[in-house]
Amino acid sequence: MTSNGWLQIALFSAIVILITRPLGWYMTRVFAGEWTPLRPLLRPVERFIYRCCGIDETEEQSWRTYAVAMLFFSVAGFVTLYALQRLQWYLPFNPQGQAGVEQVLAFNTSVSFVTNTNWQSYVPETTMGYFVQMMGLAVHNFVSAAVGIVLALVLIRGFARHEASGIGNFWVDLTRCMLYILLPASVVVALVFVWQGVPQNLSAYVDATTLEGAKQTIAQGPVASQEVIKVLGTNGGGFFNANSAHPYENPTALTNLAQMLLLIGIAAGLTNVLGRMVRDERQGWALFAVMSILCSLSV
């Protein structure tokens, strides 16, 4: 490896270390329902969601109730995503006229995205219309990531609480994760991606003629909004088959750095959440060090 390569690794590692503690502080306060810079703006929205869904944010759930709520939510998400794929031909925002997804592939994709696995056994450009990409796959990039984060959170609560009647409320944790963490970060970074050249439109694909005279179809669509949550939620399902190796998903060095930081930021921050919740930040840094060593060995 060149000296420039080592310098890039050192710079990236330094940035991750610098953002770990602020992210841990922010996420800890979000899940505790305490003040954060975004709380005055988003708290009314949070309360509105609770009222509409009949959620008591002060109610603590046992681990069984929490697990059942998580499974119910995931099954409902699976059914919805499966139906969207099968009915794709009848849905709007499908300028390429993509047909309904075949049964086995729709099942495979639904299970994959609901479980945050995001295995793709298809070519997105020739399989999925914009409506399914936005309302199906992108939505599950959000919610499956949120489910994973809140499950890590309740594991931390299990370590931190010595005597308690519950481990939190799944619906409250999920709402706060989506509203205060995933959505704000996604909106801001998606705008940066658009600025850097990532497409964000509902236009049909463009037919072009190359310099050699060959015909080429250039795929586009609402890429930026899905790309940011793909990496922030450590999801594997990209808008294009090449994922972040595609120039429309990752056009510049700045977007590449941003995507790497998004991929690891929440995981790094959760180590600090652990330290804060057990009232010993050294425990969080110890876990961070172990994760860093394993990551370094794989570089």
Question: Where are the language model's segments positioned?
Answer:
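Membrane-proximal intracellular helices of multi-pass ion channels
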Residues: 1-299
